[in-house]
């Protein structure tokens, strides 16, 4: 049996401020740092270890992974970073307050942008100061590859490309893998692994910094999945609450 651990980054500063974040490189809040330490302690207490780790090129996911591995005394584990594990690009919504955006465009429209799988938010323009194409972390991307906005289907396409080319072969070779990433990135992976319908993924929420474990067969088909807490597996349908840490 193969085990895969997925973890969404801890609370970010813009999660705290209720802003659309996307590819904006926002750090963890103090609470997010605590959540990451708690996640590492949970994994260590439950006897987990890892051979290789994957994350995005955004600091909130990277820092969460660093803290988790530090808490587990696994700082030596090789870490692979890729833009393909970045959060969904929210286009011109990035940086905007979600409540204020709902007041401007209407709650129904914002809900469609956030939760539908195939509707993109308004795109950034290339002269927008939020356009990140010239950031050195993206220098390998061709202009046509760099998103100005994304729907969940767009995000899923790049995430699964990286899954099949990089992560799945490691799992099949017996490596113990952890992925520290973002809400929509993990939603994309869960949709694929569990073969969820479009309706099923719309209502799927991923909590910050709580380990989600998938037990997989030799073909990487899910046997079962569950969240972890200090007390072990959490009953199906329940999500553990963070404790003060």
Swiss-Prot record:
Its EC number is 5.4.2.11. It holds the Pfam family His_Phos_1. The record marks 182 as: Transition state stabilizer. The active site is at residues 9, 87. GO terms for molecular function: phosphoglycerate mutase activity. Keywords: Gluconeogenesis, Glycolysis, Isomerase. GO terms for biological process: gluconeogenesis; glycolytic process. PROSITE patterns: PG_MUTASE. Substrate binds at residues 8-15, 21-22, 60, 87-90, 98, 114-115, 183-184. It catalyses: (2R)-2-phosphoglycerate = (2R)-3-phosphoglycerate. Catalyzes the interconversion of 2-phosphoglycerate and 3-phosphoglycerate. HAMAP family: PGAM_GpmA. Belongs to the phosphoglycerate mutase family. BPG-dependent PGAM subfamily. This is 2,3-bisphosphoglycerate-dependent phosphoglycerate mutase. It comes from Bacillus cereus (strain ZK / E33L).
């Amino acid at each position: 049996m193969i085990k895969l651990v997925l973890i969404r980054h801890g609370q970010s500063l813009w999660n705290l401020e209720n802003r659309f974040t996307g590819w904006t490189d926002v750090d963890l809040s103090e609470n997010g740092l605590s959540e990451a330490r708690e996640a590492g302690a949970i994994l260590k207490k439950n006897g987990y270890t890892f051979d290789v780790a994957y994350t995005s090129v955004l600091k909130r996911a990277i820092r969460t992974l660093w803290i988790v591995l530090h808490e587990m005394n696994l700082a030596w584990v090789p870490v692979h970073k890729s833009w393909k594990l970045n959060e969904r690009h929210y286009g011109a919504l990035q940086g905007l307050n979600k409540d204020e955006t709902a007041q401007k465009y209407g709650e129904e429209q914002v809900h469609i942008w956030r939760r539908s799988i195939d509707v993109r938010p308004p795109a950034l323009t290339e002269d927008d100061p939020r356009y990140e194409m010239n950031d050195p972390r993206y220098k390998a991307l061709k202009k046509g590859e760099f998103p100005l906005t994304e729907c969940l289907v767009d995000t899923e396409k790049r995430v699964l490309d990286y899954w099949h080319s990089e992560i799945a072969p490691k799992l099949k070779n017996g490596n113990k893998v952890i992925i520290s990433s973002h809400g929509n990135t993990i939603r994309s992976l869960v949709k694929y692994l569990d073969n969820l319908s479009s309706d099923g993924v719309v209502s799927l929420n991923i909590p910050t910094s709580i380990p989600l474990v998938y037990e997989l067969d030799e073909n990487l088909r899910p046997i079962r999945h569950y969240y972890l807490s200090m007390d072990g597996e959490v009953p199906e349908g329940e999500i553990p609450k963070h404790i003060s840490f």
